[in-house]
């Protein structure tokens, strides 16, 4: 008779043939962020970092990154630490893989919300990412995605220094983008000390939208660049997660940092001009 300990979760997590294992509850936001990555980016990377202890905290991490290899800094990243997982193990110092994000989304579409999902790679089959969807302790819904050969020359380390930060009410900030996305493809964002100005083209006119939003910055007038409204509208799907959104900026670049239940999402967007 099979004991309670001998369930699929324990078998996979304790299998010495698996060099990396990540087990988590697949909630709606995880599926949503992967879908956003698919819509914005052409490819998806996963990075597993070995478990170590630093300042009393376990440093084992699971990172999902989407980017385009288009010589811009456009990037979306999810960073999840061990505390966000049911189980997380990486037997290598770090492991970096590349997958087809469309294939990954198809697998996630098969998962009911709040089911357990386990990602793992086998020592004797390092060319595939295995995915097991667990609906009960004895279920065995295993599938796999072929890995794509990495070109390490095209992988940026994502070390970008931003000058200042804007803290804006999320729902109000993103409602502007959704409001005007149907009439313009781009938007210019300009800060002026404690206010922020949104400028977009509508026909032959330039309209200013809500230039009295309070922001947390002491800088003088700065044009933050011209940004794609479709991309910003996709990011706005996460406004309900957090009441205030932090937007970091440098010349011709924006970064959004959104804390969610399973970690943090980072959106980096480069100006179109």
From Swiss-Prot:
Name of the protein this chain belongs to: Uncharacterized protein L108
